[in-house]
């Protein structure tokens, strides 16, 4: 351990006495504890163990389950139905059985048996013959149909071909000129003008100043000297001038009150660095849950525990 501070082993905090955490299993000494027992005992390859049966199709080659029975692939359902109908037909010895008497009509609601009027023809369920419906025929045409849609083909539509009419370029400008000249010709004289001096509608502004303004005052520009200012006499030394005194400097006078000598506060004469007592060290601790799992499921009984997976 170095003279000052902690060692690297103490800083890590792993090299210390392990905690007394147990789940009730017996203690075996490290000397008698086997090392890598699974490498030379029991099976060398550990499989996944037994799997519980599942109704899913995962793990098979086909996505859907197919039934496979003996000679099922060679059966034809159509052929089997035909053979069954032939066997049933062979059981018929003669013709169909017909009773000696005909069907008796019921005497109840909806029948006309025993009534005076008998059945009404209009209420009969038989289909009434109807006359053959003749179609009215197509409409007759007064003129043969026109060919084409009419776009780009003259004299094909119902209306006649449009006759040519000239359209001068400056027609709108000429019409405007004619309207302006006709309007000016209707005017009798020129524009109406008054010979009076124009006046304002309201009183004059009393604050209006018609006289010319005085010239603006010129601001004197401050002159900036490039050369720094130097006083006429040199600067005085500290302490002032000593001319006229007996001594050039004042005589020394002792302090009336005695000054205490300060001592340096050093409690440790050897000047050693203070190290506090080390606190608790951190240690990697396994969880009790993981220890219980390792105890319950191990290399000896892993294949007897049913798997939860479906494949």
UniProtKB/Swiss-Prot annotation:
It comes from the Eukaryota. The keyword Lipid metabolism does not apply. InterPro entries: CFAP96. The keyword Cytoplasm applies. One of its GO terms (cellular component) is cytoplasmic microtubule. Keywords: Cytoplasm, Cytoskeleton. Belongs to the CFAP96 family. This is Cilia-and flagella-associated protein 96. It comes from Danio rerio.
């Amino acid at each position: 351990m170095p003279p000052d501070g902690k060692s690297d082993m103490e800083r890590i905090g792993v090299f210390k006495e392990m905690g007394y955490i147990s789940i009730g299993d017996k203690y075996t000494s490290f000397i008698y504890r086997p090392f890598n027992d699974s490498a030379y005992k029991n099976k060398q390859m550990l499989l996944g163990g037994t799997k519980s049966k599942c109704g899913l199709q995962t793990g098979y080659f086909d996505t859907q389950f197919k039934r496979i029975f003996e000679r099922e692939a060679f059966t034809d359902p159509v052929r089997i139905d035909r053979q069954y109908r032939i066997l049933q037909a062979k059981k018929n010895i003669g013709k169909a059985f017909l009773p000696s008497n005909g069907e008796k009509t019921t005497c109840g609601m909806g029948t006309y048996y025993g009534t005076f009027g008998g059945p009404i023809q209009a209420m009969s369920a038989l289909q009434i013959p109807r006359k053959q419906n003749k179609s009215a025929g197509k409409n007759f045409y007064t003129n043969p149909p026109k060919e084409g849609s009419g776009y780009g083909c003259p004299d094909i539509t119902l209306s006649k071909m449009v006759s040519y009419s000239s359209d001068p370029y400056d027609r709108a400008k000429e019409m405007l000129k004619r309207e302006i000249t006709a309007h000016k010709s209707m005017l009798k004289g020129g524009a109406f003008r008054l010979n009076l001096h124009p006046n304002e509608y309201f009183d004059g502004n009393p604050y209006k100043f018609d006289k010319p303004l005085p010239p603006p005052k010129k601001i004197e520009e401050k002159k900036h000297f490039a050369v720094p200012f130097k006083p006429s006499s040199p600067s005085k030394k500290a302490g002032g001038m000593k001319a006229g005194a007996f001594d050039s400097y004042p005589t020394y006078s002792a302090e009336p009150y005695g000054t205490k000598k300060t001592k340096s506060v050093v409690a440790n004469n050897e000047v050693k660095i203070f190290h506090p007592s080390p606190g608790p060290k951190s240690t990697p601790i396994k969880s009790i849950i993981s220890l219980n799992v390792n105890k319950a499921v191990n290399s000896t009984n892993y294949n007897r525990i049913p798997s939860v997976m479906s494949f």
